[in-house]
Amino acid sequence: SKLLKYSASKNKPVAVLIKNKTIEQEISNKKNKKKNNLSRIFFIKKLLKSIKKQTKIVSTTGYTSRELFYLRENYTKLKGKDFYMVGGMGHSSMVSLGISINNQDVICLDGDGSMLMHMGSLRSIGFYNPKKFKHILLNNFCHESVGGQETMSKGIDFKKVIDAFGYKNYFSIKNKENTNLILKKFL
């Protein structure tokens, strides 16, 4: 209230600075990574080696887009046409749907936070059931790139969720060992 009055009277912006970990304690994904030995960058690299050259990738905000960009820039054989949704949290699936409706192969690399933020898009995807659309959920249980706050995705049965929205298939990769096999079935 005082800051708003000050801002209005002086016609100047104000800011409230909050110490790290004041609102919510950061969670660590190290335990989860050790448990299933599957990192996001490992998966993205495997995916890039498995897809057709003309396949477009739309990647969600944060580390997913940065890691995809890094892999594309540093491995010349993996160059492609990607759309990095940096700052567009929750919208990668709808952009991907639009691309697929134009009869183009597209993969959406989505995060659990992003997916939960715009669940209505899942119904549109299930309704249109585009044949050239592949939706990949990278569930790390947190908004990693903006401080690691929990997404509350623990306990959600995503198979039941996408079934309810009309998705036709569901595949789950739990560890490095089954990554290639599941990607082959999925793609």
Predicted regions and their residues:
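Residue-level preference for the first positions of well-ordered beta-strands
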Residues: 11-15, 54-56, 105-107, 132
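Internal gly/pro-rich beta-alpha loop/helix module
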Residues: 1-12, 17, 29, 183
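Thiamine diphosphate
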Residues: 1-6, 42-46, 50, 70-187
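Short helix/loop capping segments that flank catalytic or ligand/cofactor-binding pockets
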Residues: 25-26, 67-68, 118
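Acidic-glycine-rich active-site phosphate/pyrophosphate-binding loop
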Residues: 56-78
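Active-site pocket-lining segments that scaffold enzyme catalytic pockets across diverse folds
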Residues: 27-60
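Short beta-strand segments
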Residues: 15-19, 58-60, 109-110, 135-139
